[in-house]
Amino acid sequence: MMVVCAAAAVRFLAVFTMMALCSLPLLGASATLNSVLINSNAIKNLPPPLGGAGGQPGSAVSVAPGVLYEGGNKYQTLDNYQPYPCAEDEECGSDEYCSSPSRGAAGVGGVQICLACRKRRKRCMRHAMCCPGNYCKNGICMPSDHSHFPRGEIEESIIENLGNDHNAAAGDGYPRRTTLTSKIYHTKGQEGSVCLRSSDCAAGLCCARHFWSKICKPVLKEGQVCTKHKRKGSHGLEIFQRCYCGEGLACRIQKDHHQASNSSRLHTCQRH
């Protein structure tokens, strides 16, 4: 009986020893797996800029293609957009103009920057504010009518543009603003065009005040009502200023117009 018990104890001890020896590789594999799992979490705590969006600790890395940080993230231009400062329109692109942004723009501080051009029927103060193919008329961007531009002037501008492009290709390589655009802006203004002086307007037009700005208006013809200024410089008080009478005409009191008050007599353009 004791011999049987001793044999059973020996068998049990042998089996237990074998189980202990077999469990060692499993424990090693488990430890290795745990270390891999622990190390796999390290990708979530990478230092910037490899730690995902913003590079903050604990932020997950996106596995979508094209989203990894490469210095040119497609979302970076929207969040970190920097306006281009300028001093005049020529420093901006062909579809931009130089001006101060609206008061609602934050972080600009009143500095002039390049803004997107204004499309047709949008308010404007000068030609450069309107998109290509439009010009400023009566404070509104209107489509340009190129028929009044001299053909020779346009051809000369194209030749100058080709010369500038050739110089840019052979020289520093920087693009230059075309001459044609500047010539269009400096052509004689038509009726309703914004102006500063009468020399800015075409023949038969003068520069006269209209609301808050000055526009090209027709020179008065014979029989049309005119304004007789008693003092020099008094025309600056008019909101709707009239042009002067045409050549050979003078602003005089209408002969067949009789009023009781001398101040209300009607003046018209008459022959000398």
From Swiss-Prot:
Residues 1-31 form the signal peptide. GO terms for cellular component: extracellular region; extracellular space; plasma membrane. Residues 86-141 are annotated as: DKK-type Cys-1. It is found in: Secreted. One of its GO terms (biological process) is negative regulation of mesodermal cell fate specification. Disruption phenotype: Triple knockout mice KREM1/KREM2/DKK1 exhibit enhanced growth of ectopic digits. Disulfide bonds join 86-98, 92-114, 117-131, 124-136, 130-141, 195-207, 201-216, 206-243, 226-251, 245-269. The keyword Secreted applies. The keyword Secreted applies. Glycans are attached at residues 62, 262. Changing residue 242 to E: 50% reduced binding to LRP6. Keywords: Developmental protein, Disulfide bond, Glycoprotein, Secreted, Signal, Wnt signaling pathway. Interacts (via the C-terminal Cys-rich domain) with LRP5 (via beta-propeller regions 3 and 4); the interaction, enhanced by MESD and or KREMEN, antagonizes Wnt-mediated signaling. Interacts with LRP6. Forms a ternary complex with LRP6 and KREM1. Interacts with KREM1. The C-terminal cysteine-rich domain mediates interaction with LRP5 and LRP6. This is Dickkopf-related protein 1. The gene is Dkk1.
